[in-house]
Amino acid sequence: MPFNKHAIVIGVGPGLGAALVQKCVREGMKVSAGARDRDRLRNLLDERGLHEVPALACDVTDPASVQSAFDDAIADAGTPDLVIFNASGYARGSVLELTPGQLEAAWRVGCLGGFHVGQAAAKAMVGAGTGTILFTGATASLRGSANFAPFAIAKFGLRALAQSMARELGPKGIHVAHVVIDGQIGEAEGDAKLKPADIAEAYWSLYRQPRSAWTIEADLRTWVEKF
């Protein structure tokens, strides 16, 4: 049943991003979805039966693109109550062979992009004194594995951003949380991978938390994952 709330999900692809959009729609929210390639996003949303969800062009590395996406979303559906940053810059390779450009590209999407989206979300929410901002992390948020320096650097930085924003914005009524996805995401049979729909349920629980018991960081993994 609709309850007149607005969610903006940035970094929507066929896995977790689409599952987050679907969950918010099922719960009755007005949802705006953003990704770098608007046409591809529109096709994905239509394939999932999400015809009513606007597809926004949003290059998270470009602050003007992010602000334009937020302006369009807010004009269409009002101030966001929930913003999810789900974009990620993935790169791997030996530190002996990686180029500065590869490292910077991963950081610009995964960390700087989080700043652009988080800042736009905070500016939209602060006047209302309420809202939730969620950042998607990974195992690499906590551990830099061999050959994953660019990804880990971006994810470490995103986690630091989320922590800083949580401490600054919490007293202003805005709930900021970082979610560590500790494992691979997919629809494989059994429990070897985290299922997108199940992760989306966890995000929804964070959004619905009462102010007296906010989670600032959550880590999700399958029951068979070693940690």
Language model features by range: what are they?
Residues 57-69, 100:
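The beta1-alpha1 cofactor-binding region of Rossmann-like NAD(H)/NADP(H)-dependent oxidoreductases
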Residues 132-157, 163, 170, 185:
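Catalytic loop of short-chain dehydrogenase/reductase
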Residues 13-14:
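Conserved glycine-rich cofactor-binding loop
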Residues 171-227:
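C-terminal helical subdomain
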Residues 94-95, 102-107:
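Substrate-binding pocket helix/loop in short-chain dehydrogenase/reductase
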Residues 118-119, 163:
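A short, exposed helix-loop element centered on a Lys and neighboring polar residues
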Residues 27-43:
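Conserved glycine-rich Rossmann-like NAD(P)H-binding loop of the short-chain dehydrogenase/reductase
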